């Protein structure tokens, strides 16, 4: 995407359909790996419990949808200085806490293979949190560095993959409520405008609506991170 912008000196980069094709290709690979993995198969944790539900081969279309939806939702959230980075940082810290609880439960039940799997995911979580903390020093308002699509789409992929491989896919719309808000508000705005020629929000995604209402970029970032943090705390407390 960046190389196209530099080589052809245009801001377009990859076209939307090209990005979707690439995302779909990666999503299918992830779905196949998940389905073939003996430790995952079609099992998913039911939110707020330590119980799992098995979807069998049905996990394949679910993983494909979740991967593409999550990747683009995080990308849509990257509209203000530090917003996507701070929200993702809190999300990854929250999902790490949930993974740690699940890993401890697996260790208690003598499931050592699951424990090793979760330890690997925790390493990715901590690495992502540390990277984002350093990045935010330069990306918070006023930003000196911008992640662009190469950053936000990658972050979305990490959020999706860690959650999926941890059998925590169903937590994404809950813990990632602010990512979902960005996507849903954008869809509502487009669909409603095409039908009525009127806007539901002053501007979409929702963080731009808040900006139009007079909230500063710093306050919006704090709001998104706080809400994500509160939801993460609720998720963790229900599992303890």
Question: Language model features by range: what are they?
Answer:
Residues 6-22:
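Membrane-interfacial loop-to-helix junctions in multi-pass inner-membrane proteins
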Residues 3, 28-37, 42-44, 49-51, ...:
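Alpha-helical transmembrane segments
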């Amino acid at each position: 995407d960046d190389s196209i912008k530099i080589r052809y000196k245009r801001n377009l980069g990859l076209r939307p359909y090209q990005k979707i094709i690439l995302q779909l290709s990666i999503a299918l690979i992830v779905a196949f790996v998940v389905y073939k993995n003996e430790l995952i198969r079609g099992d998913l944790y039911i939110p707020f419990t330590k119980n799992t539900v098995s979807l069998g081969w049905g996990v394949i279309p679910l993983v494909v949808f979740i991967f593409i939806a999550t990747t683009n939702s995080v990308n849509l959230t990257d509209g203000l200085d530090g917003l996507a980075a701070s929200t993702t940082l809190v999300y990854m810290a929250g999902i790490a806490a949930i993974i740690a609880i699940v890993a401890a439960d697996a260790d208690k039940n003598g499931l050592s293979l699951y424990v090793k799997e979760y330890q690997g995911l925790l390493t990715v979580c901590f690495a992502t949190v540390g990277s984002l903390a350093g990045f935010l020093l330069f990306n918070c308002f006023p930003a000196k560095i911008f992640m662009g699509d190469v950053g936000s789409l990658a972050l979305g992929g990490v959020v999706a993959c860690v959650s999926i491989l941890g059998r925590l896919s169903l937590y994404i719309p809950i813990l990632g409520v602010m990512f979902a808000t960005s996507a849903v508000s954008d869809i509502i705005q487009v669909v409603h405008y095409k039908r009525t020629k009127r806007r539901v929000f002053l501007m979409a995604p929702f963080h731009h609506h808040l900006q139009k209402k007079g909230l500063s970029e710093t306050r919006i970032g704090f709001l998104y991170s706080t809400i994500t943090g509160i939801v993460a705390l609720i998720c963790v407390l229900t599992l303890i």
